[in-house]
Amino acid sequence: MRRGLYVGRFQPFHNGHKAVIDGLAEEVDELIIGIGSADISHDIRHPFTAGERVLMITRALNGLKIPFYVIPLEDVKRNALWVAHVKSMVPPFDTVYTSNPLVIQLFKEAGIPVLSPPMYLRESLSGTAVRKKMYHGEAWEEYVPKEVVSVVGEIHGIERMQQISKSD
């Protein structure tokens, strides 16, 4: 059995993430989705809580053809210890999938195979681009699964984002 670990912040979970996961479902038998920076929320780069991101991802992946686990991963203040922390928090895995340069380096140094899945429409489908649209009141809904639109509405996410982006 092949089990992969896909690590990202998912702020928010968007169609690019979904496309990567759909592709990974063809490569692995089970997928662990590690929500990075799970301890940070309510700021410009991290507007959503770990629990809100779990909800977004779980709903958006309902019907995925392989079993998956969504696990929040808190940051640690020493990067050299982060891989050991991750390994203690998730089921055993064979390969890490990420495009984050730091995450790639840390897992490679630990001797764990790392693959960078191809990014899907990276110019328009990045968390930064989607958040920018959300902050500025622009159309963002087409860039995320419909289930994410629902979660953002339930938690009043746009209002939160616009409030925390104000300066005093």
From Swiss-Prot:
Its main location: cytoplasm. Its EC number is 2.7.7.1. Gene3D superfamilies: HUPs. One of its GO terms (cellular component) is cytoplasm. Pathway: Cofactor biosynthesis; NAD(+) biosynthesis; NAD(+) from nicotinamide D-ribonucleotide: step 1/1. It holds the Pfam family CTP_transf_like. One of its GO terms (biological process) is NAD biosynthetic process. It is an enzyme of class 2 (transferase). Keywords: ATP-binding, Cytoplasm, NAD, Nucleotide-binding, Nucleotidyltransferase, Pyridine nucleotide biosynthesis, Transferase. It catalyses: beta-nicotinamide D-ribonucleotide + ATP + H(+) = diphosphate + NAD(+). GO terms for molecular function: ATP binding; nicotinamide-nucleotide adenylyltransferase activity. InterPro entries: Cyt_trans-like (IPR004821), NMN_Atrans_arc (IPR006418), Rossmann-like_a/b/a_fold (IPR014729). NCBIfam families: arch_NMN_Atrans (TIGR01527), cyt_tran_rel (TIGR00125), PRK01153.1 (NF002243). Belongs to the archaeal NMN adenylyltransferase family. This is Nicotinamide-nucleotide adenylyltransferase. The lineage of its organism: Archaea, Methanobacteriati, Methanobacteriota, Stenosarchaea group, Methanomicrobia.
